[in-house]
C-alpha cells in the first residue's frame, strides 16, 4: 500500500469538495477543472447519468444543484479511501486502483425547482454518496448518487409506496469515527478488505432461492445492526428488521440476483466501501414496491459503506439508484413525479 499517494489523493478530494462550495461559481469551476482529468467520465443518478469532461459535470449536475438549493453545504459522515480489490476472482493485478469516497448529506434551502420538482422554500437534506478514482494526481472517474426518492418525499411527493423501513434516517456512524483523514492501519485495513470480499462474493451470492437462512446473513450482521437504506426502502434498525423489511421483499423480486465484479471494493481500518455500476444483475421475477414482475433482466447501480466490529457488520449505509432500476421495469418515476405534482396543483 502506497500510503503517501493515498494521503495525497485524500487531500485532492477534500480540497475539491471545499472549493465546490465557494460562493464565486467561477472559482468552484476552476477548482473542478484542476481536480478532474480532462477526459473524466462521471457516472451519476438517473436522469443525469453518464457525462464526459468537467464542464458537463458542472453544467448538468453541480451548478443546477447549487442553483436550486441555496447555501448548499456538504456535511460528510464517512470519508473512506483505499486500493481496490473488486474482482470476484481476486486478481488485484487487473484492479488495484486508488479510490477516495464519502457519504453524508447536502444541506440547503430549496429555493428553485429541481428536475421538475417544485421548490418549497424550506430546508432539505439531500443524501449523497461519491467514489472518486484518483490517478496521477487527478480524479479520472467519479461514481456518485443523490437520493432523489428521499428528496421527493421531503417535498411531499410520493412516487413509491410508503417505505417498509424508517424513512428519512441517514445518520453518521454512532461512534462519530467515520472521517478517516489520517494514514490507515495496514493490518486492520487488510482484515476488513478480506472480510468484505468473503461477505460480498460468498455470502451475498449464496441464496438458494428458497430460504433466507441459506444466505447466512446472521453470520455477517450483528443482531442490532443499523442498515440505512435509500428512499423507497428506508432504514432497518435490527437484523430482524433487515430480513423482514428489505431482504425478503428484495429476494422475492430478484431471486436470481448475482453480485458481479464491482467497480471498486476497498477498506480502511474498520470501514469499507464498494460502488457497483451494474454491480448486481437480476431478473425482475416478483413484485417489488408496488410494481408487478416484469420478467426483465435488470442491472442495479448502487453504493455501499460498512463498519465492521470483529467478524460482523454493525452499520451499513446503502444507495440504490431506484429511478434507474424502475426505468428497467418500464416505469418512469420522473414522469410519475411530474404527474403527481400536476395533480397536486390542479
What role is predicted for each listed range?
Residues 1-346:
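C-terminal and inter-domain tail/linker signature
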Amino acid at each position: 500500500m502506497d500510503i503517501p499517494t493515498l494521503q495525497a489523493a485524500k487531500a485532492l478530494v477534500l480540497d475539491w469538495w471545499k472549493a465546490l462550495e465557494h460562493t464565486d461559481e467561477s472559482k468552484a469551476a476552476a477548482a473542478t477543472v484542476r481536480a478532474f482529468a480532462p477526459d473524466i467520465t462521471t457516472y451519476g443518478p438517473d436522469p443525469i447519468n453518464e457525462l464526459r469532461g468537467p464542464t458537463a459535470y458542472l453544467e448538468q449536475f453541480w451548478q443546477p444543484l447549487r442553483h436550486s438549493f441555496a447555501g448548499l453545504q456538504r456535511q460528510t459522515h464517512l470519508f473512506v479511501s483505499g486500493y481496490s480489490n473488486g474482482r470476484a476472482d481476486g486478481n488485484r493485478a487487473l484492479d488495484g486502483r486508488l479510490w477516495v469516497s464519502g457519504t453524508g448529506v447536502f444541506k440547503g434551502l430549496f429555493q428553485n425547482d429541481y428536475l421538475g420538482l417544485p421548490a418549497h422554500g424550506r430546508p432539505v437534506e439531500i443524501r449523497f454518496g461519491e467514489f472518486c478514482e484518483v490517478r496521477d494526481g487527478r480524479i479520472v472517474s467519479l461514481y456518485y448518487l443523490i437520493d432523489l426518492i428521499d428528496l421527493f418525499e421531503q417535498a411531499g411527493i410520493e412516487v413509491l409506496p410508503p417505505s417498509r423501513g424508517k424513512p428519512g434516517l441517514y445518520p453518521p456512524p454512532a461512534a462519530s469515527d467515520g472521517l478517516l483523514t489520517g494514514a490507515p492501519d495496514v493490518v486492520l485495513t487488510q482484515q476488513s478488505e478480506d472480510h468484505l470480499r468473503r461477505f460480498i462474493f460468498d455470502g451475498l451470492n449464496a441464496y438458494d432461492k428458497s430460504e433466507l437462512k441459506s444466505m447466512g446473513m446472521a453470520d455477517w450482521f450483528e443482531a442490532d445492526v443499523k442498515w440505512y437504506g435509500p428512499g423507497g426502502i428506508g432504514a432497518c434498525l435490527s437484523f430482524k428488521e433487515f430480513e423482514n423489511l428489505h431482504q425478503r421483499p428484495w429476494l422475492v423480486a430478484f431471486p436470481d440476483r448475482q453480485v458481479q465484479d464491482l467497480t471498486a471494493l476497498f477498506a480502511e481500518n474498520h470501514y469499507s466501501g464498494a460502488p457497483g455500476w451494474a454491480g448486481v444483475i437480476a431478473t425482475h421475477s416478483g413484485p417489488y414496491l408496488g410494481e408487478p414482475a416484469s420478467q426483465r433482466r435488470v442491472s442495479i447501480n448502487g453504493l455501499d459503506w460498512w463498519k465492521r466490529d470483529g467478524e460482523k457488520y454493525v452499520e451499513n449505509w446503502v444507495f440504490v439508484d431506484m429511478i434507474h432500476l424502475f426505468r428497467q421495469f418500464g416505469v418512469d418515476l420522473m414522469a410519475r413525479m411530474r404527474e403527481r405534482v400536476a395533480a397536486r396543483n390542479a
